[in-house]
Amino acid sequence: MSLKRDFISRVQKELKQVQSLRPHGIEVTLPSDSLQLWEAVVPGPEDSLYKGGRFKVQVYVPENYPLEPPTVRFLPPIYHINVSPSTGHVCLGFLTGENWLPTRCISDVLSGVFALLIKPEPENAADQTLLNMFHNNKLLYEAKARSSAQNRQDDLTAYI
């Protein structure tokens, strides 16, 4: 598969920028020679249920990026209404086809994931069961989310 020169140039520039700026303390690496697959470690925000956790996120950049949005997954999935419990796929409003803007960059995507840990988007829920708990038994939902973050303080190395 041959990637277009514009794609390569843009993605290399964005990678360099994210690695030097480290928005929100997010660390980014490429697990292989492919510019299409990024791995990031996202710290749990201090003012969130995920405080203290460190979460591995995989970003897949499609060939026609920036016309098409990247896809994002938590590996392993985290306990969050916007994350599929089975695949880790992140449901973030501005990553949907109709809301995606080609002027956005991968740094925006990672910042959006970080912000999602602070403020979930119920309108973009990935799982109906979690959404019901979020609305009907918020204390239990919050306890499970906190617990999942605590469990992720030490075991991140198993996934990197």
Predicted segments with their positions:
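UBC/E2-like fold recognition across ubiquitin and ubiquitin-like conjugation systems
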Residues: 1-160
